[in-house]
Amino acid sequence: MTIVIYSKTNCVYCTKAKNLVKNLGLEYTEKSLEKDFGSDPSKMLEDIGKNVRLMPQIKIDFELIGGYNQLVEYFE
């Protein structure tokens, strides 16, 4: 399973998403707006493949599932 979490600093739900995945014993790749995209949202949106406004955004096996609430639902 490939998990990518798109995040930004000071994002409570980004931290919750990362902790949820860690607590499930799964590995993930984090892509940070500031570190990986030079704080340019357009570059991040291009990588995500969809115009989204909320963070985090999560891809599982290269499919965008949405944000934190969708991540919780995915693993229920």
What are these regions (language model features)?
Residues 49-59, 68-69:
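Structural micro-motif
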Residues 60-76:
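Non-catalytic, surface beta->alpha helical segment in thiol-disulfide oxidoreductase systems
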